[in-house]
Amino acid sequence: MPQNEYIERWTKQHGKRLDHDERVRKREARQSHQQSKDAQNLRGLRAKLYQQKRHAEKIQMRKRIKAQEEKNVKSSAPSEPSKTPLPQYLLDRSEATNAKALSSAIKDKRAEKAAKFAVPLPKVKGISEEEMFKVVNTGKKTHKKSWKRMITKPTFVGNDFTRRPVKYERFIRPMGLRYKKANVTHPEMAVTVQLPILSVKKNPQNPLYTQLGVLTKGTVIEVNVSELGIVTAGGKVAWGKYAQITNTPENDGCVNAVLLV
């Protein structure tokens, strides 16, 4: 048994108090009074956090109540079939329609959609601006101007990228830290292929890093998967798919990613 389950272990060894159930019932009955008291008397940040917590609880409670109230509503079908011909799209009207089954199907579709965009690394460690940028001092003689920044992490820039004039370039992306290809692993096919990067979709650190094309751990990139021969539901060959970077490119010297399928 794990070390932190000592209360459960003690209960298994010695049993519960004789009035345990009664005490639990009374504690639950007092809970609503305590919640009301807290809602009325808490002030400041504690009140704000408490209201957020209660708001989330109420939403979950309403969802549960709504799920329980769903009835099996069936459409009334005519007793005798009509002799007049019906078009194809009206033929299923005569069949009984189960409302609960329909709503469940819609919920399943939504859950599938949410799972479709689930990523292998949901949380990543934050990177400070001091670590991301190096201050570049400029100025003709004094070098006192320090508005330029050099990016110290790997980046991606497209083929059509052209640098701004040096005088106006605020963010410098070194050529040695630019990557054009990524080692992408397909989780279902269990193969790793080197694919060209098309764009940086989302950097979890900062929207500015997404705009600059910074490649850090957890970044979602778009890769060209035409070599894999992946076909969409419509029968067309998929061109670009999203993948998430799973390694630390500045340490490894390469970009490793997992395809989001």
Swiss-Prot record:
Motif Nuclear localization signal 2 mapped to chain: 52-59
Keyword Nucleus: yes
Cellular compartments annotated: Nucleus, Nucleolus
Domain of life: Eukaryota
InterPro entries with a match to the protein in the record: NSA2_fam (IPR039411), Ribosomal_Se8/biogenesis_NSA2 (IPR022309)
The entry's keywords: Nucleus, Ribonucleoprotein, Ribosome biogenesis, rRNA processing
Biased composition (Basic and acidic residues): 1-31
Regions of compositional bias (Basic residues) in chain numbering: 51-65
Motif Nuclear localization signal 1, chain ranges: 15-22
CC terms in the record's Gene Ontology section: nucleolus; preribosome, large subunit precursor
One GO BP: maturation of LSU-rRNA
Segments of this protein annotated with the region Disordered: 1-87
Keyword Translocase: no
Quaternary state and interactors: Component of the pre-66S ribosomal particle. Interacts with nop7 and rrp1. Interacts with rsa4 (via WD repeats).
Described purpose of this protein according to its UniProt entry: Involved in the biogenesis of the 60S ribosomal subunit. May play a part in the quality control of pre-60S particles.
Protein family membership: Belongs to the eukaryotic ribosomal protein eS8 family. Ribosome biogenesis protein NSA2 subfamily.
Name the record gives this protein: Ribosome biogenesis protein nsa2
